[in-house]
Amino acid sequence: MQLVAALAALGALVAPAVAYPHAPMNETLVDVQLTAIGNTMIKAIITNKGDTPLNMLQFNTIMDENPNRKVMVFKDGWHIPLLYFVNRFFTTLAPQASVEHSFDIAATHDLSVGGKYVVTANGAIPTAEEHSTTITSAALYESNELQMDIDGNQAAAVEQAMNFTPEMQSIHARALEKRTKIVGGSCNANTLRATQTALGNSARLAQAAARAAAQNPQKFQEYFRTNDANAKQRVIARLNSVARESSSANAGVTTYYCSDTMGGCKPRVLAYTLPSRNLVVNCPIYYNLPPLTRQCHAQDQATTTLHEFTHNPAVASPHCQDYAYGYQQCISLPAAKAVQNADNYALFANGMF
């Protein structure tokens, strides 16, 4: 993922989210308004505009307490990348009721330059009926556009959400100098072997998926909600880039860690990516997955790695976001978001092959 969540490992609370009846996304159910309450502090007001209570999933949405992508931050028209990501529960919201959530964008974005920024929020919140954890739909939202004038020095003083230590920066720099993908010091024999196997499988899946995208319009429509020629070329190019990046364990544009030293591996997280550094980290439960599943739309190490590579801008730009997880939610996305959603690529590769 900008975190991949291990849905199957969540138990009764949210396990039903893995498979639920196909329901289109609702574009009018939820309203999100942003206001500035400090130099880099933002308050988001999320309102249920419907006439029935909603049980709204917090994980990897604007309501998540962890450092996921809550908003998009722009300066002079350029997107400021998220430095990291992350965990999960539900919030029940009565009809016309609102919930407020405040967060500091300087904890997850580098705003040290200061000046004028534009902040927006958009995405999808999986929803269930009141007193239920069975996902039945998802509410798309797009907030107002918030203009902020930020003091760079104050922003730089905000504690970062993840511990990217000087030692880690040094390791990362050495890895880039040598064009090393897997950082050997982060692996033991078992995790190194598993990661190398996942890379090989990811390469084969991505190559096969790229061919299928060109040759199977029915399946392309199923997973990406369009057969537009430009969208198809974008998907094929991204899959080919993932295949190239996965094809070697000692050369490439990303740095790959077998283990986490930055504190991003929260409960239920399989792996995560830092797009600003083109860095991928496997979490302990990644190694509980099978190397390559035979079950359609199930999680495995290969498609988790494929998913993570789509988040890296050095692999393909613009890099993918996490708008939705799981087959039913992903195929409910509109085409523009499906083509930019990481899990659509992993599911397409797995579902075809």
From Swiss-Prot:
Propeptide feature: residues: 20-179
One BP annotation, GO: proteolysis
GO molecular function: metal ion binding; metalloendopeptidase activity
Disulfide bonds: C187-C258, C265-C283
Subcellular location: Secreted
Active site: E308
EC number of the protein: 3.4.24.39
One Pfam family named in its UniProt record: Peptidase_M35
Note accompanying the cofactor annotation: Binds 1 zinc ion per subunit.
SUPFAM superfamilies registered for this protein in UniProt: Metalloproteases ('zincins'), catalytic domain
Residues where Zn(2+) binds: H307, H311, D322
Gene Ontology cellular component list: extracellular region
Residues annotated as signal peptide: 1-19
Catalytic activities: Preferential cleavage of bonds with hydrophobic residues in P1'. Also 3-Asn-|-Gln-4 and 8-Gly-|-Ser-9 bonds in insulin B chain
Keywords tagged on the record: Cleavage on pair of basic residues, Disulfide bond, Hydrolase, Metal-binding, Metalloprotease, Protease, Secreted, Signal, Virulence, Zinc, Zymogen
Domain of life the protein comes from: Eukaryota
Names of the cofactor(s): Zn(2+)
Annotated function: Probable secreted metalloprotease that shows high activities on basic nuclear substrates such as histone and protamine. May be involved in virulence.
Stated family: Belongs to the peptidase M35 family.
Protein name: Probable neutral protease 2 homolog MCYG_07155
Organism of derivation: Arthroderma otae (strain ATCC MYA-4605 / CBS 113480) (Microsporum canis)
